[in-house]
Regions:
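Sec-dependent N-terminal signal peptides
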Residues: 4-13
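Periplasm-facing N-terminal accessory domains of Gram-negative outer-membrane beta-barrel systems
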Residues: 7, 18-97
Length: 97
């Protein structure tokens, strides 16, 4: 019975560890010319947690593997990206027609 209890607790703890937020970083560029985009909003979908890209188009934030990042910038199509197991996320935004 104790073995079963320890097995259950071990599985439950591993799920909790997997769901924890991890630092994610990346870069957002323009699909038109490959230049970094400054000031792109990067938000975790369904939350108010987010950040903006810097002068190099780089961003950093904490997110879980199940989180979806929403990238938005004036004049560009909004893009959603599932974090998954990626710690580095490269995103290209396309201009609106």
């Amino acid at each position: 019975m104790k073995k079963l209890l320890f097995l259950f607790l071990g599985c439950a703890m591993s799920v909790g560890i997997y769901a924890q937020s991890v630092a994610r970083q990346g870069k957002v560029t323009s699909g038109a010319n490959g230049e970094p985009l400054i000031g792109v909003g990067v938000v975790i979908k369904g939350s108010q947690s987010g950040t903006m890209t810097d002068i190099n188009g780089a961003f950093s934030l904490s997110a879980t593997p199940n989180d979806v990042l929403v990238f938005s910038f004036i004049g560009y199509e909004t893009k959603e990206v599932l974090v998954g197991d990626k710690t580095t996320i490269q995103v290209t935004l396309e201009e609106k027609d």
